[in-house]
C-alpha cells in the first residue's frame, strides 16, 4: 500500500526539490497520518528483554494471547492477523534457526485515528496486570516497557513484516501466519480514566516494585 509514483526523501531534500516535477514525500508526520474510518492497529510483542517476573505472569495467565485478552477482552472477537517479523527464523543454510521471540499482530479497529491512544491504554492496562517493567538504557535512563510496544503507534514508522529478500545460503523457516476472523472493534480506553505517565509509573515502581527493572 502507499502512494503511487512517490519518492520518499529527507525533509531537506524535499525542500530542495519543491520546484521539480518529482512528487516527493518525507517519512514524517508531515506526510503520513491515519485514515478516516477503520484501520489496523499493530501490536508488536517481543520476549527478548522481558524479565522473569513478566514471563511468569504471562504463563500464569495462559500465554501471550490469554494475557492480551485479559487486558483487552474485546480482542477475542476481533479481526486480527498475526505474522512474524521479517527476521524471524532466518539462518545460514545448515544451521538451526533460533526460535522467534515475538510477532506482529494487526487488529482491525473501527477508528484508525484511535491507534495511538489505544496503545497507551493497553500499556497502562499492562502495568495494572503486572505486565509492565523497566529497562535501563545505555545512557542510564529508566525506560518504561510492557508486553507491547507503544512506539509503533506513529503512522510514519516502518514495520518489518514482509518476507525478507535472502542472499545465497541464507534460509528462513518462517512461523505460520495466524488469521482470526471477527469484527472491527472499538479501541480500548485508559483504565479508570488514568493517562499513561512515565512519571507516575516510575513513582509506582519506586513505591511498590510490581515489575522488574533490568
Per-region residue spans from a language model:
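Signature for HUH/AEP ssDNA processing cores
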Residues: 1-103, 107-129, 213
Amino acid at each position: 500500500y502507499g502512494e503511487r509514483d512517490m519518492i520518499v526523501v529527507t525533509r531537506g531534500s524535499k525542500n530542495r526539490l519543491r520546484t521539480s516535477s518529482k512528487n516527493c514525500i518525507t517519512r514524517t508526520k508531515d506526510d503520513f497520518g491515519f485514515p478516516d474510518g477503520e484501520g489496523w492497529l499493530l501490536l508488536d510483542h517481543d520476549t527478548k528483554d522481558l524479565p522473569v517476573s513478566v514471563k511468569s505472569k504471562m504463563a500464569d495467565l495462559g500465554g501471550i494471547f490469554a494475557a492480551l485478552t485479559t487486558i483487552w477482552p474485546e480482542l477475542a472477537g476481533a479481526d486480527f492477523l498475526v505474522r512474524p517479523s521479517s527476521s524471524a527464523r532466518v539462518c545460514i543454510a545448515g544451521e538451526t534457526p533460533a526460535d522467534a521471540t515475538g510477532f506482529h499482530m494487526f487488529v482491525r479497529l473501527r477508528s484508525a485515528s484511535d491507534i495511538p491512544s489505544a496503545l497507551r491504554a493497553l500499556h497502562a492496562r499492562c502495568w495494572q496486570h503486572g505486565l509492565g517493567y523497566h529497562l535501563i538504557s545505555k545512557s542510564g535512563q529508566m525506560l518504561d516497557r510492557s508486553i507491547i510496544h507503544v512506539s509503533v503507534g506513529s503512522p510514519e514508522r516502518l514495520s518489518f513484516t514482509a518476507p525478507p529478500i535472502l542472499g545465497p545460503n541464507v534460509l528462513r523457516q518462517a512461523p505460520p501466519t495466524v488469521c482470526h476472523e471477527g469484527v472491527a472493534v472499538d479501541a480500548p480506553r485508559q483504565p479508570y480514566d488514568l493517562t499513561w505517565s512515565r512519571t507516575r509509573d516510575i513513582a509506582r515502581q519506586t513505591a511498590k516494585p510490581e515489575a522488574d527493572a533490568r
